Amino acid sequence: KSAALFDWDKALSGWDRYPLFRDNFLQLTKNHATAVDCPTECGLGCPRSVITHAKTDIRAVCIEKEHAAIQLSPRQTLIYRLKQSAINGAICTAMGIEHREAKLDGLPHTWRLGDFIPTAGMDFPVVLTMQDSKDTLVEVVRSLCLSTPKPFVVIAPTRLHLSPAVETLLAQKDSLFVALNEDLYLGDAPRLLTCRDKTEIFAPLIDQVPGPDSGGTVFFMTPPGTTWPQIKIQFRDGHTVTIWAGDQSGRYTYTQMGMASRKN
């Protein structure tokens, strides 16, 4: 995403954290704007042409000649773009996502951020997408549903383009939608911080982790930071196993551990 500084100011000047965001997450490019968004609420929605008469005489001109020209500073015509990698990394740090960034081919303005890993051996892909319409968001989510075999997380700036069609697609895949403006805010560092606990944000996915009494395969909740020397496994009686990891322990059957079949 890129735009003239005039447009960034117009869109985000009402946000009290905008100066901090601008200075840390926008990057100057070598390009200059030839048009900017019209600030007049006339209903036409057409851009204004940027006309340079002199270095200090730059104006945004209404092409419909409905309104007077607006004086622009040279800096306001400079094109700034999002520091996408910095934003992606900040989101991952704030939300406890294992950062493994990749651009997704064929999906515009969409990135694989990494994985949400509630416990060792179980991970959920996390995708950030920035779309400008309901239709494009539907197409992105439909493509993700077809290409991703497991439940996943879709993160978008807001719920503005979230439609019933997207909600249905995600529900069919037991997947989750997260709106950044609802769950993150910009702190003073500057860094992104969560508005609620991560276990609450990702609760629908955490609930998919099988428990010890589920009768199926379970996932041992390995404490964060546990190293291999801190893990101990003891086979008991031919059908149960006890696991210690740091200060956590548990006793499970071979079936729960996915070891009942000789193939495992």
What are these regions (language model features)?
Residues 115-122, 141, 263-264:
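Secondary-structure-rich domain cores
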Residues 1-78, 164-167, 187-264:
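Intrinsically disordered, low-complexity protein-interaction/activation regions
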Residues 138-152:
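Short, basic/hydrophobic alpha-helical segments
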Residues 98, 117, 123-137, 146, ...:
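Short acidic, S/G/P-rich loop/turn micro-motifs used as interaction or catalytic elements
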Residues 155-163, 182-185:
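Short beta-alpha junction loops
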Residues 77-121:
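Active-site metal-binding core of divalent-cation-utilizing nuclease and nuclease-like domains
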